[in-house]
Amino acid sequence: MPVLIAAVIVLVLGVAMKAGGISIGSAPRGVRANNPLNIESNANNNWVGKVSPSVDSRFETFRAPEYGFRAGAILLRDSYQGRYGLETIEEIIYKFAPSHENDSDNYASFVASQLGINANEPINLSSDATLAKMLHAMSVMEVGRYYSLEQAQEGVRMA
């Protein structure tokens, strides 16, 4: 029960555990909402692990970051590659993080560098290892270095 109470406090107040201790409300909104990719709210998406109502008016809130990575895995693999046929990091990032809100070139270049390929090379997101690395790199661009590759891998495993 104390763990549940602490989880509610973290979610509601935006308490972020950092190496230097606890800071109230200083973590990025995606961290406060357990949404490492800042996935936008959409009434049509009934994600497993989704918290309703969201603590953020624009972005989804998840019970744990692994559920946010899970949603990202499904979004990239099933929608972006499966439905839309996006084959490169550049194509995926330009849809996920459009240039009217982001520096999409820098975003795509960073993600590609983390995967060791060019941003305009085809990428196979049916590979769990590749998908987890991509999601982890995207989380760094979205919220900073708050999450581990292992958390992204768990989200992919759950997808």
Residue ranges of each PLM-predicted region?
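Membrane-penetrating hydrophobic segments
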Residues: M1-I9
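Cell-wall polysaccharide-cleaving catalytic domain and substrate-binding groove, primarily
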Residues: L11-A159
